[in-house]
Amino acid sequence: MTAAPLLVAYEIDERRRAVVAEVLQGAAEVVYLTDLGEAERAAALRGAGVVLASNTSKDLRPGEAALLAETRLLQFMVAGVDFIPLGDLPPGLPVAVNGGAYAEPMAEHALALVLAAAKRLFIEHRKLETGEFNQFTPNRMLAGMVACILGLGGVGVETARLMRCLG
């Protein structure tokens, strides 16, 4: 008996397909849903062992989620699935997410926005565009301040870690 294939439900480019092939080293057949016609799609969805998806509301057509009843795992490649209509999926289908995968870059972005706000970056930049150079309006110093992090998931924890360097 052969293993059920890995089904990639979203569009990926040739470079990423090469990465998938290299990582799997032939351990599983890989089927790309975006390469298939209507009848082939239904058969591939019914027979998939594991499905990699980005957003099933976009990756799958209406009614296709029900075809995943025999799938052993639906792995989302995104960190959060708040926007995914999980109720459309077959009951009992194990779902995994990529939580925390983007924690470091998101935390750095949060820190950059905090610094930009504290230093009035956007306000002063707009003034510079009109020829006004304002060097006298004080901006906030962040050293010793307290940051309030709402949510301590992967992004929140990493943001708190970065903010700690400010005091």
Predicted regions and their residues:
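Phosphate/diphosphate ligand-binding glycine-rich loop within oxidoreductases
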Residues: 49-127, 136
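Rossmann-like dinucleotide/phosphate-binding beta-alpha-beta segment
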Residues: 136-167
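N-terminal glycine-/charge-rich "phosphate-binding" loop or analogous flexible N-terminal tail
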Residues: 1-51, 57
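Cytosolic-biased juxtamembrane loops and peripheral soluble domains of multi-pass membrane proteins
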Residues: 130-131
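Loop/helix-junction capping segments adjacent to catalytic residues or to phosphate/diphosphate-binding pockets
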Residues: 14, 104, 157
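Short loop/helix-cap segments at secondary-structure boundaries that form the rim of catalytic
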Residues: 18-23, 42-45, 64-66, 83-91, ...
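Phosphate-coordination loops involved in phosphoryl transfer and adenosine-cofactor binding
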Residues: 3, 92, 143-147
